[in-house]
Amino acid sequence: MEMMLLEECCEILDSMRIPITASNRKEGIYPYYGANGIQDHVADYIFDDELVLLAEDGGNFGSKTRPIAYRVSGKCWVNNHAHVLKPKEGLNVDFLCYSLMFYNTEGLVNGATRQKLTQTTMRKMLIPNLSIENQLY
């Protein structure tokens, strides 16, 4: 099966992430995402798109039951503990998410107490290169 690098098939929007300490968050309606999902709700948003968030640090790396990637849609805020991926044309957002949810990160993450998937390593992760029709079924 032909494979493709994440950096080839996704826009990596990590530079747009902004962490907000709990004491500085203004309560609101927009989800505030971290490595493992919604952490809070805040008054503003920095993204408004169909995206996949992939844990950077503190993720469920190695788990067979808890995913390391999840799909978000619409207005939200993402902190610096999740990589932000926007699929390029020809890559379905659900297929991207499914391909990454339980990705084998053995040998890809580092850190003794808090494992981290660096952006450099994440960019080289491979997913199947399927036609859009095959991604949908």
Language-model-detected regions and their locations in the chain:
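A short beta-sheet element
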Residues: 34-36, 44-101, 110-113, 117-122
